[in-house]
């Protein structure tokens, strides 16, 4: 808690944040856009809505949510998204990157998902002069316990940071 509290500072500006479906959010010229989309993987059922149901339930105010009582983690019923297929995910990222081409972009995405790291960099590079990838080692804590000894729970979470210009952090 102390380290989190120490990270809070006053930049002297009036700041606003929005949350919601990045495809639908209406905001003019955001400085920074953070996107943590559902991950598509043909090898896993780690579908965002089904796995992160508590956060999703809160975001939906528990409206229209159907819980699968027979699952250990009480997953949600699957809801289709643009990220439900490989092509759909690539197209959705392209649309998001284009929509926010004038903003700093930070995208969180898993190494075991598709599009791949190289494909994500290529997509973001269509709209950003600079794309950096920050890999963070991560271990799934639940859901793949049958494979705990095979390292299938170990992945990298990538933070893709895209921006234009040389000194993006000092523009104001």
In which residue ranges do the predicted regions lie?
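A general structural motif
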Residues: 14, 30, 102-104, 130
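Conserved Class I SAM-dependent methyltransferase catalytic core
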Residues: 78-128, 135
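Glycine-rich S-adenosyl-L-methionine
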Residues: 54-96
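Accessory, usually C-terminal, subdomains that scaffold auxiliary metal cofactors
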Residues: 43, 49-62, 82, 127-129, ...
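Short, solvent-exposed loop/turn segments at secondary-structure junctions
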Residues: 23-24, 39-40, 112-114, 139, ...
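SAM-dependent nucleic-acid methyltransferase catalytic core
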Residues: 1-48, 61-75, 79
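A short acidic (Asp/Glu
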Residues: 27-30, 43-51, 116-121, 144-146
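Class I S-adenosyl-L-methionine
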Residues: 117-121, 128-171
């Amino acid at each position: 808690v102390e380290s989190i509290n120490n990270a809070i500072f006053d930049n002297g500006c009036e700041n606003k944040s929005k949350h919601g479906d990045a495809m639908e959010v209406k905001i003019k010229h955001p400085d920074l856009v953070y996107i943590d989309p559902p991950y598509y993987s043909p090898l896993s059922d780690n579908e965002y809505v089904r796995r992160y149901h508590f956060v999703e339930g809160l975001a939906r105010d528990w409206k229209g949510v159907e819980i699968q009582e027979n699952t250990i983690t009480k997953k949600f019923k699957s809801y289709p998204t643009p990220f439900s297929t490989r092509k759909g995910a690539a197209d959705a990222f392209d649309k998001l990157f284009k929509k926010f081409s004038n903003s700093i972009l930070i995208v969180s995405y898993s190494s075991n998902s598709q599009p791949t790291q190289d494909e994500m960099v290529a997509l973001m590079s269509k709209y950003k002069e600079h794309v950096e990838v920050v890999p963070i080692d991560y271990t799934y804590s639940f859901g793949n316990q049958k494979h705990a000894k095979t390292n299938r729970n170990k992945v990298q979470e990538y933070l893709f940071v895209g921006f234009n210009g040389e000194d993006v952090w000092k523009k104001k």
